[in-house]
């Protein structure tokens, strides 16, 4: 037989403490201050030129990313100053009523510091040679670049006062299957 009384008391105290606005110690509150950074590579690009547009598939993937982020709170969207990254970032930024903010992919340590200091839930769109590197810098690991054929990774970095956790998601998106 399951004794339901302890759970009932726990639930009662949780509700009472929550509704009464009990002030927990400041250190406990600070540990709960959380923001999340999402890092993705730009979607499929047209050609090997310096600043190509997205392919039709890349446009579809960018719309799919927007749908993924519909239920995710974002306060900022960042992109490098290339058409392929801007094209990937814009659908999500527009759906959130945000402007795409630029960053320099050649200064990833500076970008990392600014993201941590900004303490905002944010999407950062980069490149195959910068996205994994930036994720690694954010969590203190050597992740490095990844192959140019990979477009389906979403790095999620959860930041609290005392910890930074990295989760890697793989999207199920396939071109032409919207």
Segments predicted by a language model, with ranges:
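Bacterial N-terminal signal peptides
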Residues: 11-22
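Hydrophobic alpha-helical segments and their boundary regions
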Residues: 7-10, 47
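Short beta-strand segments
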Residues: 125-127
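Sec/Tat signal peptide C-region and signal peptidase I cleavage site
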Residues: 24-29
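Noncatalytic modules at the cell exterior or secretory-pathway interfaces
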Residues: 121-123
